[in-house]
A protein has these predicted regions:
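Alpha-helical solenoid repeat scaffolds of the TPR/TPR-like class and their adjacent stem/linker regions
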Residues: 1-169
Length: 169
């Protein structure tokens, strides 16, 4: 139920493994774009890496309004995020994180409520940019570019709790 996602109690119950208990009371889920104007925002990655990559497409919308955006993420996607969104501060989950230093604390997936309500709200443009050294390493590994399309896929979906093995290739 898409609408139910924005109810705080349901959200906290469903994401309790990813949202630290100290942060949960500060979460703001039902924001409008203007609610972020000139504010310092702490974004919590409350979902798996695949969803973080998908919802990170909303970060430029948030950055355009907020005075400062700090994103708490697991280390795995952090290098890609730092290269793609250079004006966002990315930090790993820290037990000593001072959430009181931020005007708002929001779950990454909840940004969709503020910024993605209609098809027209999706920019339809690339938003992930690998680092130059990563591009060069892959060029060296794959060899000269040919006319044939080269595609590689790898995906692991979900967790044991969400039947992830059924959603992986």
């Amino acid at each position: 139920n898409y609408e139910r996602r924005w109810k705080v109690s349901w959200f906290l119950r469903e994401s309790n493994a990813m949202v630290p208990a100290a942060i949960a009371p500060r979460l703001s889920l039902d924001n409008q774009p203007d609610d972020f104007n000139g504010k310092s925002i702490l974004v919590i990655a409350e979902q798996g890496v695949g969803d973080q990559i998908m919802f990170s497409s909303i970060l430029p919308d948030l950055v355009s309004r907020a005075s400062k955006v700090t994103f708490v993420s697991v280390p795995k996607p952090m290098a890609l995020f730092k290269a793609s969104f250079p004006t966002v501060d990315f930090i790993p989950p820290l037990p000593s994180l001072r959430i009181g230093a931020f005007d708002k604390v929001i779950a990454l997936g909840s940004l969709a409520y503020a910024f993605r309500n209609r098809l027209e709200d999706f920019p339809g443009a690339p938003y992930l940019r690998p680092r130059d050294d990563v591009i060069e390493a892959w060029k060296a590994r794959l060899g000269p570019k040919t006319t044939r399309l080269r595609v590689g896929l790898s995906w692991q979906g979900g967790t044991d709790r969400t039947s992830g093995q059924k959603r992986s290739i």
